[in-house]
Amino acid sequence: MNQQLSVTKRDGQREPLNLDKIHRVITWAAEGLHNVSASQVEIKSHIQFYDGIKTEDIHETIIKAAADLISEEAPDYQYMAARLAIFHLRKKAYGQFEPPRLADHVKRMVENGRYDRHLLDDYSSDEFDQMDEFIDHWRDMNFSYAAVKQLEGKYLVQNRVSGEIYESAQFLYVLVAACLFANYPRDTRMAYIKRFYDATSEFKISLPTPIMSGVRTPTRQFSSCVLIETGDSLDSINATASAIVKYVSQRAGIGINAGRIRALGSPIRNGEAFHTGCIPFYKYFQTAVKSCSQGGVRGGAATLFYPLWHLEVESLLVLKNNRGVEENRVRHLDYGVQFNRLMYQRLVKDDFITLFSPSDVPGLYDAFFADQNEFERLYVQYEQDESIRKKRIKAIELFSLFMQERASTGRIYLQNVDHTNNHSPFDASVAPIRQSNLCLEIALPTKPLQHVNDENGEIALCTLSAFNLGKIESLEDFDELADLAVRALDSLLDYQEYPVPAAYNATMNRRTLGIGVINFAYYLAKHGVKYSDGSANGLVHRTFEAMQYYLMKASVNLAKEKGACPKFNETTYSQGIMPIDTYKKDLDGVCGEPLQQDWDALRAAIKQYGMRNSTLSALMPSETSSQISNATNGIEPPRGFVSIKASKDGVTKQVVPDYENLKDNYELLWNIPSNKGYLELVGIMQKFVDQTISANTNYDPGKFDAGKVPMKQLLQDLLYAYKLGVKTLYYHNTRDGASDNQSDLAAKALKNRDQAQAAEVMVEDDDCAGGACKI
């Protein structure tokens, strides 16, 4: 039978079926791996051979068979499946396993319009040969299967209509480096390209989706996050909508500040008409956000911000829930509700909160961000002024409505605007921060546009990347990595294009970066400490202190070479004020760890040279790019040892790093008794991080009486986060049991119930709904 059947190769030629060839490829993929079996994969794939079967179909069946065998007991199948998938991918891209010469590849891709022509203008064929010398294509074999699927789905340059792929991962990494360092002097740039290539291809620095998929192509917009503030005029609202459309079409996630829009029934033109209120304009923004899919990489998404004291707040808080009718709901945006000290004080004193339309209370909206004492003075004054339209509501009722909607939708976020402005690299009197972004980790100044080309408006962009904490052996490692990350991202600001002048001006003036971390849960497990019991507090304090210190040092060094950013005078750094001076002192009760770095020397250097970047750090979610590095997501605890990720590119399994050695050290999300320990760690990180943190709150109703989380508990966590200086809260996760997919391997472990529930979990990839401000 073996003789009669033939296979159809990729080039269309037919040859006799050779089972030995298939066996050799599978055996090659299993080499050196622990507890995997080539014959097991062959049995599992039970290929139905027929005459003329495509070799491509055989290959895909084998890959799927290996991927299906990934489990806690045999995590190495994720590497076996990955090797088979890499083999397949290279055959698709190059027609063979061996990658071509880099210079030939770049030339061909530029001719086909898939790479940016500047690559050939900036580098000679000899220089590409030099890069070829240090490219290590065997690093492809360090990817897990989940990583290869992400590369294929999101990152590699391809034709998204036909599905053809044109490159493999090492070319991606080296060409990103070549693009970012192209303008460096010829005598130093090759060394930077090599160092940056090594850092990214060895997963020490993790890059965000827009950079991985876009740098080297002709589309030049790589800022993950865009923050746009609207004014209260129709012109400004229209300008905001057009800016949203421009940025959504170019892979960015959007934060919209709509807090200035006046309330329903406000007079227009001295009462000639009355205002339709916020909801029709929110709907307009929602339509703008959903108008484009982000370069085929993900669907558009936005978070919209407004203050808790807005007159329409009771109608705004329910916009996302599934009750109500189409007219009074705007469900496809996420929302960020803004709080400050006075709001919490009214709650604690069981007092009332008074709601106003921002248009009726001159100066109040601006003071809400820029000056807390002035806000309180005006607020009380307006409360007593009988001529002003207002509504009083018990603080506990309003907070309870907020928490109820946050809990039921999971996607109503919170920003403490006083912490955001008091503990900030910007001087709030000249550059207040009035909003955050899609995922709540960015805090940058914005100004409304009056028309889309308004040079006086300010749209904030943030360019992201992250350090993989799993690769940090000593805190001095941050020195080299911070230097590379800051240099590369700073170059990117000059390299990219800006569809809106207000974004170009803001970026050139402030040069804001947001560098975060991935693999935090693995870092804790590796050091034998936990989220829940305070054992990690000292380590986290030392780690984030070192990270911020070396990032600032890198930015000072860059300022020596290239000059400080033009609006450096609007930062608190220019006044000699550091994050270590302005953090919330209540934190000292949680962590008394002394400072380890030489902050005085850094302060002196900043005074002398300034800094190249107004901001340097932000802790973002990293669902996608942490899969590339086979790391845990951002600062989050894993939900299970094996996660099954579902996205538009299919379903993949990923096992937590070093599972076999560290399984007893990992603390899984639903085994953590409360939010207290996690919030304390977030507070410690926030002491050093100059922007903010995508911090989540998690609740398991099964731990409470009658299976319901008491409102008292929700409000306690809210107040505790405020007390620790937490600036923002992102998702509210509720354990519903549905994500704890009991799998057959979990059944074997049922004698240990907690572990059984933790065995495999399904994690929805909400990257399609957003994820632009993730990395």
Name each model-derived stretch:
Residues 217, 482-504, 508, 530-622, ...:
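Internal maturation/activation junctions in enzymes
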Residues 759-775:
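Short acidic, low-complexity intrinsically disordered linear motifs used
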Residues 157, 164, 171-189, 193, ...:
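Function-dense linear segments that define catalytic or interfacial modules
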Residues 77-110, 339, 420-451, 513, ...:
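Terminal amphipathic helices with adjacent charged low-complexity linkers/tails
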Residues 1-3, 13, 36-174, 178, ...:
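Core nucleic-acid recognition elements
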Residues 88, 95-137, 223-469, 473-474, ...:
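Active-site cavity-forming subdomains of large catalytic enzyme subunits
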Residues 44-45, 63-65, 79-87, 199, ...:
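A glycine-rich phosphate-binding loop feature that marks nucleotide/adenosyl-phosphate handling sites
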Residues 124-151, 440-446, 489, 493-494, ...:
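Catalytic alpha/beta core of large soluble enzyme barrels
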